[in-house]
Amino acid sequence: MTDEGRPKTPAAITTECSLIVEQHLNVEFYRESRAKFLSTCDDYALMMLVSKDHGNKFWFSIWEHQIDWFENQNIPNQYFTLACGGSDLMFLFPVALFQSWKEDLSSRIYPKNGRKYWHINIKQVSGIWNLQTKKEFDDISLEEFQIGEK
């Protein structure tokens, strides 16, 4: 169980998802930790986050320490992958793009450790998968980042 009392995603699911990303990028990864993958060619870093299906909505958190991990890598191609309920629906996007979205997203400081995290809420609206932003901003379409077929 995590600190919040929720069970962790089984490692087999993140591995299955990483294999699909390998095919999509035509690169081979090895696992550095439960969610972190590096390519054997040293050109790619990948963070694999998995959400349960919450009725056609998916929730994630991206933490400051996860961004710090990317910043400490001397690797040109850095990606987040958001796996929505498993490997059938995933969104793959560059970390640099997430950096440009951060101000539009809700964030919080976790009181137990003082770390900042961003709320990542994905919802399908009128057939389009969107990253939901704060009310004063337009939601971000994730269609161009979709891999998988849900």
PLM regions: where:
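Non-catalytic C-terminal interaction segments of nucleic acid-processing enzymes
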Residues: 91, 96-150
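Acidic-basic catalytic patches of nuclease active cores, encompassing PD-(D/E)XK
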Residues: 1-42, 52-53
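Catalytic cores of nucleic-acid endonucleases
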Residues: 53-90, 95
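Glycine-centered tight beta-turn/hairpin loop motif at sheet-sheet or coil-to-beta transitions
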Residues: 41-43, 86-87
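A broadly conserved detector of short glycine/acidic/proline-rich loop/turn motifs that flank catalytic sites
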Residues: 50-52, 135
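Structural alpha-beta junctions
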Residues: 22-28, 73-76, 103-107
